[in-house]
Amino acid sequence: MIYSILKRDGREVVFDIEKIAAAVEKAMQSISYYDHLSDEEQENYHSYVRIMAELDWPAYLNGDTVFHQRVISRYEADGAPGVESAIYDYYGALYLKELEDQLSSSDVINKERLPLFHEALLLYQLGYYHGAVAILITQIIGITADIEKFLEKNNSSYDPETLELIKKRYGFDRKNDTARVMTAVVEGMSIDDDENEYGFLLGYLRFKLFHTHMPKEETEKHVNRHMVCHGTQLNYGTKEHALKVILCIDALAWVAEVISKNLAE
């Protein structure tokens, strides 16, 4: 099923929701807590992903069907402000504690990163968003490197088909940081976005977080790793900026868990 989304900046994005949903289902099954969705829940999930894609929130991996319905209801009633309110309510203190626990228990992520995650999440809760972003933005590639080292330690490597897809479709080699992150995601989720290049998480990482440049109007809502690390983006001190980076960290931690589970099978 191909969806067309008109984003807030006027751009049209076309993507195949069934391929994304199938990839998420396969990944969730591999970590053994996925309950098969009913037809109604599946349709709600499709609607949820469309809303997240339209509003540029990298939260589409969320598997909570109650939250899906809440987002849909808020969107229908209040549009983007309603959705953003629901997001901030949902991704609160309990979520942050669960995320920190997940990071701490990972057999993939380097334990020396844990104090950084703890401090960044604490800064976020205290409202020091510049500090939270500055710490976490450096850890995206860090988690990716941990995944690579984990595979190497276990005498494994990325599937050659994954590497070929990244090289052929996107023109990247794995020395490129963007390609390294995308390779990890594709490996973990078995995404083959043949119908669209904008599979949501891949698109967000590629065009927002890791793009070499971002227009000023985009920087008002998104963090760009290159611009932050080179000191050219200074306006990333908002709750929205920080939570979007946290969600990217969460997604990569989830991918790391999937890869670990797959390797153990």
What are the functions of these language-model segments?
Residues 1-35, 40:
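Long, C-terminal-biased catalytic regions of enzyme "large/alpha" subunits
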Residues 1-5, 110-125, 224, 228-231:
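Short amphipathic alpha-helical segments and their helix-coil junctions
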Residues 7-11, 127, 234:
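A generic structural motif
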Residues 16, 91, 108-116, 219-223:
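Helix-boundary capping/turn motifs
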Residues 29, 34-103:
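Internal, Lys/Arg-enriched amphipathic helical interaction segments that engage polyanionic partners
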Residues 96-111, 189, 210-215:
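An acidic intrinsically disordered interaction segment
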Residues 104-140:
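A long, hydrophobic alpha-helical segment
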